[in-house]
Amino acid sequence: RLRSEIDHVKKQCASLQSAIADAEQRGELALKDARSKLADLEDALQKAKQDMARLLKEYQELMNVKLALDVEIATYRKLLEGEECRLSGEGVGQVNISVVQSTVSGGYGGAGGYGGASGLGSGLGVSGGSGYSYSSGHSLGGGFSSGSGRAIGCGFGSSGGSSSTIKYTTTTSSSSRKGYKH
């Protein structure tokens, strides 16, 4: 009877050792599977970060283009308002447009200028142009000038990031005529 209990305990011990071995094997497989899933998730996270950085860069470039176009629209609007005032006979003082600079990365650069002239005679000339080029960055330019006693100019430049600088000055000359009755 003692021998049968010993045999029974040995069988239980063997069965428990087998269960332990099976549990260790299942644990190792689960650990390998978890490590594989972790590696896949880390790869997906790295790819998501790269995609996010690329999308952020594209967004910043689009915002820079939008800013430049907004500046150009504001400049043309001011030029048109100045022309309307000049044609209606109202005096136009000096007008300045200020634009907050936005820098993304690297450096920034900009250029602007203004000029004025007056003379006799009448005439009106308008010229304008804008361009856009893309090559690991972007560049925008625009220009406008009008004659008839006034010259107006603006400039915009961008390099290695983004910036916008506009200087816009309007000068007018006026004369008064007095009529005499005889």
Curated annotation (Swiss-Prot):
- Which PROSITE patterns does the record cross-reference, listed alphabetically? IF_ROD_1 (PS00226), IF_ROD_2 (PS51842)
Q: What is the lineage of its organism?
A: Eukaryota, Metazoa, Chordata, Craniata, Vertebrata
Miscellaneous note, as given in the UniProt record, is: There are two types of cytoskeletal and microfibrillar keratin: I (acidic; 40-55 kDa) and II (neutral to basic; 56-70 kDa).
The lineage's top-level taxon is Eukaryota
Region feature (Disordered)? 158-182
Q: Where is the IF rod domain?
A: 1-87
Question: One of this protein's Pfam families, by short name?
Answer: Filament
Instruction: Name the species this protein comes from.
Output: Bos taurus (Bovine)
On whether Coiled coil is a keyword of this UniProt record, the answer is yes
Q: What protein name is recorded for this chain? A: Keratin, type II cytoskeletal 59 kDa, component IV
- The annotated region (Coil 2) lies at 1-83
Q: How does it assemble?
A: Heterotetramer of two type I and two type II keratins.
Annotated region (Tail), positions in chain: 84-182
Q: Cross-referenced InterPro entries, in alphabetical order?
A: IF_conserved, IF_rod_dom
Annotated keywords: Coiled coil, Intermediate filament, Keratin
Site Stutter: list residues: G27
Low complexity composition bias: which ranges? 161-176
Family indicated by similarity: Belongs to the intermediate filament family.
An annotated GO cellular component of this protein is: intermediate filament
